[in-house]
Amino acid sequence: PASAQQTPPEPPSPAWIQEFNSLPEATRKSYIDQFRKAEQLFAQKRTMECLFSLTELEKLYAGNPGLYNLRGACYIEIRNIEKALENFEKAQKLDPSNLTIQFNLAEAHYVNHDYARALKAFTELLPPFKDNPGMTPLLQFKRYICARKLDNRPLAKELENLYGPMDDTPYYYCTQAIIKFMGGDKDAAQEQLLSAIRIHGGTSAIQAFTDAMTEAGILPSPYGQTVPTEQPAKTGLEKRR
């Protein structure tokens, strides 16, 4: 039958996209071009310029969740966690199903040492990332650190041996390093970390894992402080001219 051959209708665009598409074409084009430049400024670590650019963009159109996600990422960079949380929360209200925004919000709670909220948020992210071999171990590792910080021993014990030394993730060596560090054996902890770096060095995973340890105060930072390296979410605007 003909009906069986028809393509199913596409799900409706989010409300903010529909609203954006109702703007004059010249405004949309200008906004998209300026937003891309703001993303480039962020990637180049020109954080204050990026923040200024976002203020100007907000005057053109204030409903883009990507704007608040990017602004939140800027505030994480300059360690204004309160402002970061405020912007990530605004982004999430505008785009509740965006996983990058959800992760950034969880990360902001983590950086703020609000381990109870961070643990809840990272746990909620596990199902949507279950098929992602890179993200799942990182989420579980952050849950492990939260559990240790909250003195949730049953959960920490459960997560300790989630991965082994042969798995394609630094998880095992980094959890072992934390066990040694928190037990006062710094030399043994350094050995575990060196194993992780020797095996997984040069990968983005080792950077993410050691950053997580630094943010929690388990590892000292060589720069005094570290910042998350997550990229802001794509906005959906880049395909809509």
Q: Would you name each region that the model predicts?
A:
Residues 8-18, 22, 188-241:
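Terminal, low-structured helical/coil segments at or just beyond the last alpha-helical repeat
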Residues 20-25, 55-62, 89-96, 124-133, ...:
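Solenoid-like repeat scaffolds
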Residues 24-66, 70-73, 77:
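Alpha-helical segment of the N-proximal tetratricopeptide repeat
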Residues 43-44, 77-78, 111-112, 145, ...:
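Register position in tetratricopeptide repeats
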Residues 47, 81, 115, 153, ...:
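TPR-repeat structural position
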Residues 69-70, 104, 140-143, 175:
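Canonical tetratricopeptide repeat
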